[in-house]
Design a protein with these regions (language model features):
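A donor-sugar binding/catalytic signature common to diverse glycosyltransferases
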Residues: 151-202
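Conserved catalytic-core segment of nucleotide-activated headgroup transferases in glycan assembly
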Residues: 16-135
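Hydrophobic residues at beta-strand termini and immediately following loops
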Residues: 7-9, 27, 148
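Active-site-proximal region of nucleotide-activated glycan assembly enzymes
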Residues: 1-23, 195-200
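Active-site donor-binding acidic/aromatic loop of nucleotide-activated sugar
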Residues: 141-151
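Alpha-helix C-terminal capping/helix-to-coil transition sites in glycosyltransferase folds
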Residues: 2, 50, 160-163
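A short helix->loop->beta-strand "cap" motif at the edges of active sites that frequently abuts
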Residues: 2-4, 96-98, 184-185
Length: 203
């Protein structure tokens, strides 16, 4: 309708140069409320409260084959080893031993990614004898690392627990803004010696 105001969830400072019509108001990120982790998944809430958590969530549409998942597992292993060497009682102001929640969406191995079929009832490597377990065995067995195909609460709710000290994501606007808003001490150096390229995004 003529003269009607339109709010857009963006900022001119991060957009491509353009003329913004007078009836359009960039208002920045719109943060939607979400049910708490305690409401949606009390068991996960209790697990998160054990200690500072790295949350790996690469979005709904980013799938990994086994080689990529093993590469990420190796990064996780190095981060946990570095944390153990520090022997600190807290990370980013959160007390406890560093742990990892990793939402992993899997595909069948296909070099050309011609067919992105999601695994159904088949797991590659989180069980003993698999390649991921070979990298993260003790951490998986002790539940220090959780690898899941879906997290029931909204990602923003996981971040709002205050237990997440590092958010590894696919670079989407919601994930980026959620991490900046809810992660207390957003670490920019935790993975400084590790470079992982997943789907064009470098962590």
């Amino acid at each position: 309708l003529p003269g009607q105001k339109i709010l857009v969830a963006n900022r001119p400072e991060i957009e491509f140069p353009m003329v913004v019509p007078q009836h359009v108001t960039p208002c920045g990120p719109v943060m939607r409320p979400a049910p708490s982790v305690a409401e949606v998944d009390p068991e996960l809430d209790a697990w998160l409260r054990r200690g500072p958590t790295v949350f790996i969530s690469l979005g709904t549409h980013r799938f990994m084959d086994e080689d990529e998942a093993v590469e990420m597992a190796e990064v996780v292993r190095r981060v946990l080893d570095a944390d153990d060497e520090r022997k600190s009682e807290d990370v980013g102001g959160v007390r406890g031993r560093l742990q990892v929640l990793w939402k992993l969406k899997k595909v069948e191995t296909d070099q050309n990614y011609g067919s992105l079929k999601q695994y159904v009832g088949k797991d590659f490597g989180t069980e003993p004898g698999g390649r991921i377990h070979g990298v993260l065995g003790e951490a998986l067995d002790s539940d220090r690392v959780r690898v899941v195909d879906w997290v029931k609460p909204q990602p923003s709710a996981v971040l709002q627990t205050g237990q997440v000290v590092c958010s590894i994501h696919h670079g989407g606007a919601n994930s980026f803004n959620d991490a900046l808003t809810y992660v207390k001490h957003y670490p920019r150096r935790l993975l400084k010696k590790v470079c992982v390229c997943v789907g064009g995004v470098i962590y």
